[in-house]
Amino acid sequence: MAKIRQKTKRAAAKRFSITKNGKLKRKHAYRSHLALGRSTKAKRHLRKDAIMSTSDTKRYTQCL
């Protein structure tokens, strides 16, 4: 008989990806609209992916 496994949470799978070292990569918030007041430098930094903190990584790896 096959083992029961936890299903992948599709909402989490669409938002996070796992790096080679097991860390979680995510996109920055505050990118969609109302960016006129932000400087070009701030918007450029938001374009890059962010690495999730280790405490959150433990919680979200179970969802993936």
Curated annotation (Swiss-Prot):
What are the transmembrane regions? none
GO MF annotations, alphabetized:
structural constituent of ribosome
Could you state one GO biological process linked to this protein?
Answer: translation
Keywords from the named record: Ribonucleoprotein, Ribosomal protein
Under the heading Pfam families, the entry gives:
Ribosomal_L35p
- What Gene Ontology cellular component terms go with this record? cytosolic large ribosomal subunit
Q: Known NCBIfam families for this protein?
A: rpmI_bact
Family, per entry: Belongs to the bacterial ribosomal protein bL35 family.
Q: What is this protein called?
A: Large ribosomal subunit protein bL35
